[in-house]
């Protein structure tokens, strides 16, 4: 019996006790949670092979996409919805690795900017290429139509969850 069979058995037991119990909804929620966890674990393991975590990767890609590859800590924080404290911690790690450097802002001498170094540019380009192949391996298991449907359903659910929680 595989993991999902066990999960279904447990949820079906609840359904048998209460015929009104939302079996399908509970199963879908559990499948989403487990799929998300497994994907996060796989991505963490992949990025760990390059010596970074997902948060550091997101900071690097955000800087790479920025004009002149340079942003303030608050701009990064806002774009990624990370706390300023977390951005400081990640920046310390990336600076120690040689991927970013802190610079004085030209607009405000009191402010700092975080800029990708040439080593950071090379690293993120190499990592992005490897990640592209990895993502194709993961998502290539689904057909193009299944991928599109998955995207539509997830966007719809995310929008609904935003409405429900506000």
Model-derived segments and their meaning:
Residues 92-149:
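Charged, amphipathic alpha-helical coiled-coil/dimerization segments
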Residues 1-20, 145-166:
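C-terminal regulatory/oligomerization modules of transcriptional regulators
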Residues 73, 91-92:
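Short, hydrophobic-biased segments on the C-terminal half of alpha helices
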Residues 29, 33, 37, 81, ...:
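Short amphipathic alpha-helical segments with heptad-repeat character
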Residues 27, 58, 148:
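Active-site phosphate/pyrophosphate-handling residues
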Residues 1-50:
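N-terminal leader segment of winged-helix/HTH proteins
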Residues 23, 37, 41-82:
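N-terminal helix-turn-helix DNA-binding core of bacterial DNA-binding proteins
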């Amino acid at each position: 019996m595989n993991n999902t069979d066990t999960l279904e058995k447990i949820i079906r037991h609840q359904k048998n006790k209460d015929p009104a119990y939302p079996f399908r909804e509970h199963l879908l929620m559990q499948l989403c949670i487990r799929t998300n966890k497994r994907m996060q674990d796989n991505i963490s393991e992949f990025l760990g092979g390059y010596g970074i975590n997902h948060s550091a990767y997101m900071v690097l890609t955000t800087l790479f996409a920025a004009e002149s590859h340079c942003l303030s800590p608050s701009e990064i924080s806002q774009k990624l919805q990370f706390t300023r404290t977390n951005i400081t911690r990640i920046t310390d790690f990336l600076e120690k690795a040689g991927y970013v450097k802190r610079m004085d802002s030209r607009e405000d001498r009191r402010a700092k900017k975080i800029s990708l170094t040439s080593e950071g540019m090379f690293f993120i380009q190499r990592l992005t290429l490897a990640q592209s192949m990895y993502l194709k391996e993961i998502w290539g298991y689904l057909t193009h139509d299944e991928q599109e449907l998955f995207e539509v359903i997830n966007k719809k659910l995310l929008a609904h969850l935003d409405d429900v929680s506000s």
